[in-house]
Amino acid sequence: MAAPAVTELEDQEMREAQREYLDFLDDEEDQGIYQSKVRDMISENQYRLIVNVNDLRKKNEKRANMLMNNAFEGLIAFQRALKDFVASIDGTYAKQYEEFYIGLEGSFGNKHVTPRTLTSRCLSCIVCVEGIVTKCSLVRPKVVRSVHYCPATKKTIERKYTDLTSLEAFPSSAVYPTKDEENNPLETEYGLSIYKDHQTITIQEMPEKAPAGQLPRSVDIILDDDLVDKVKPGDRVQVIGTYRCLPSKQNGYTSASFRTILIACNVIQMSKEVTPVFSADDLAKIKKFSKSHSKDIFEQLSRSLAPSIHGHLYIKKAILCMLLGGVEKVLDNGTRIRGDINVLLIGDPSVAKSQLLRYVLCTAPRAIPTTGRGSSGVGLTAAVTTDQETGERRLEAGAMVLADRGVVCIDEFDKMSDMDRTAIHEVMEQGRVTIAKAGIHARLNARCSVLAAANPVYGRYDQYKTPMDNIGLQDSLLSRFDLLFIMLDQMDPEQDREISDHVLRMHRYRAAGEQDGDAMPLGSAVDILATNDPNVTSEEQQELQVYEKHDSLLHGVKKRKEKILSVEFMRKYVHVAKIFKPVLTQEAASFIAEEYSRLRNQDQLSTDVARTSPVTARTLETLIRLSTAHAKVRMSKTVQLQDAEAAIELVQYAYFKKVLEKEKKRRRRDEDSDTEGEQQTQPDGEAKKRRKKRRAQEGESHDPYEFSDTEDETPVVHTPKTPVNGQEEMETDSSAKPGLSGERLKAFKSALLGAFKSAHAQSIAMEALMEAINKRNDSPFSQAEVKAALELMEEANHIMVSDNIVFLI
């Protein structure tokens, strides 16, 4: 008699939980959030509702705690309540699907874990696990209900199937029926049977959160129905689901050790880049800094890169250009021109190569470290592995795929075998990994920059051999590196004295608050235990420090005038500068073309200069990428002559270990000397007009690569003046885009200023902005007009648009 009483009590608790969940969903009298979400779900033909745990916790804390700690019963009751609620809104839609599903998001507290901290205390609980997807199985159909017809008896048999990956408490028999009780054969009615999609993925803990010197942990995850194919290898995800153990059998007996899986109910893609939080004050400081240091901003930023390393100024400039990158172009015919910059450092031991790599790991938004001995070719690109349980082939992502849109730092590059080095050729130029193995044909994105460090062939650099003999790498690989620097350990008493003074000051420096004998922690990152960042407002309130506080012991007495930028300011400045996509001007393009031909002929002009890497057509793209990166440092919309000159200087130093002297401009052969003298005295604009006029008279065809005069001119940035009342006035720009008249632009600016005033904020979301400017407006603005006007104002540095949020500068 005890068992039926327990069952009746459990059913009563289940009905009570279902009623409370139904009250939570039916919030029409409150705010109507979830009622509108359910209606949107029905209109989009979906069957999974995403519920924020924080909302449930506010309304019914007891029920939220029971759901978190007893996931199976809680989710079953929640899903039944959702089906009842959908039936009350739309009865016909509720009959279309067998089940409706609940997905969770919000703050999970101590249940927000990584694969390493996923322990037995989390069993049968709702957990949120974050990591990188390393393996993905194929999507297979899984039978939920089978229908069988018996021709002899004219009867139909129906059977449901559940296993330990389902929410039901007891799994059903896995035997597929072929005969009925009287041994009559059965025919499967596939049209009436129900199947669901089933996929298994493996996520691994993130490299920045894994402890040093230990193997990264991983966990298997079950994805069903609409969650399959949401992720691919290399994606950073947060998976919310139920943690469950499965018995493992050996020789027909169940062993005492269990394997664990996570049954997912929601998958959230994490951002590809770690985007810092910007406030209006931060943007104002960045803009002010770029204007006040417009002449020496490249020197200032490169000097602040790795300030603990003495010297190597050109290498720091190259690393700054690598962090910013060029502009990636994908042409209409499918050709991709990469914008990533690859750098190779070759030199004697103890010249701070590995320290530079380590600084990039701390500064870059995403960086994956590897070493030459500890990495294979498939470990860097991708591998096809076999699943131990099912025997299926799986695709496993390598380090370069995991570092998509980031930086891969390869130390001890010379210790890799030639076969492994050949595997990264495609990644360095095409930005993707193509796999054709074991019946799997796949293409994975690996758009990453490569920063590699290596030693010469003989351990130390031999001055009596050519650079190519010392490097010992094949030309096909060297040409894929944009810059190759040779770092020598030269014996110079003055330089040795400066380095020793610098290193000794570093060792004597002690951070504020450091106690005797205590080591400061390596990282001070705070883990956010929620699916969305709750500390955005508190981070915005912290004031951004532009410069580090001068310390005579750390920075030296002589360098008091040389201010060092703070790491946080550098990170935010690089992130803002990467948004710009500068365009080449005719002047810069001509200069790059001339210097490229000069570099190609340098071996014939001077035999005493030995180059470090071959000058190929890729060198021309290198010059364009470096010029674009230098223009990004200045936050310019166009690549000017000074950007091209800085790029040429970097390339010359990398190729010839010194900056070559500038040649005098050769006179044009096809022009008369008198005409040339007259042209040099005239302004550039008149000379161009005369050249165009001469072409028109001679009847030449139009040159498709001719740049317009507007691209040669540097755009004038208008600084908004601050009036007496404290509000910023936006000047009217006369240059309106096609389809947007000057009057409409003026009306838009006044409406935009009114929207910022009424919101009392420095930033407005795009949807709220559209609603505000078209409110009480007789002639509302269209989406195209708003986009064109915002582009004009962004070019004039009045506003900044990022992630569909408009910032007033």
UniProtKB/Swiss-Prot annotation:
Pfam families per the UniProt record, alphabetical: MCM, MCM_lid, MCM_N, MCM_OB, WH_MCM3_C
Main location: nucleus
Domain named MCM: residues: 297-504
Gene Ontology cellular component annotations, sorted alphabetically: CMG complex; MCM complex
GO biological process: DNA replication initiation; regulation of DNA-templated DNA replication initiation
Coiled coil: none
InterPro entries reported for this sequence: AAA+_ATPase, MCM, Mcm3, MCM_CS, MCM_dom, MCM_lid, MCM_N, MCM_OB
Annotated region described as Disordered, given as residue ranges: 664-741
Residue numbers covered by motif Arginine finger: 479-482
Localisation: Nucleus; Chromosome
EC number assigned by the record: 3.6.4.12
Catalytic reaction list: ATP + H2O = ADP + phosphate + H(+)
Sequence ranges of Basic and acidic residues compositional bias: 696-705
Record-linked PANTHER family: DNA REPLICATION LICENSING FACTOR MCM FAMILY MEMBER, DNA REPLICATION LICENSING FACTOR MCM3
Known partners and oligomeric status: Component of the mcm2-7 complex (RLF-M). The complex forms a toroidal hexameric ring with the proposed subunit order mcm2-mcm6-mcm4-mcm7-mcm3-mcm5. Component of the CMG helicase complex, composed of the mcm2-7 complex, the GINS complex and cdc45.
Similarity remark: Belongs to the MCM family.
Function: Acts as a component of the MCM2-7 complex (MCM complex) which is the putative replicative helicase essential for 'once per cell cycle' DNA replication initiation and elongation in eukaryotic cells. The active ATPase sites in the MCM2-7 ring are formed through the interaction surfaces of two neighboring subunits such that a critical structure of a conserved arginine finger motif is provided in trans relative to the ATP-binding site of the Walker A box of the adjacent subunit. The six ATPase active sites, however, are likely to contribute differentially to the complex helicase activity.
Protein name in the entry: Zygotic DNA replication licensing factor mcm3
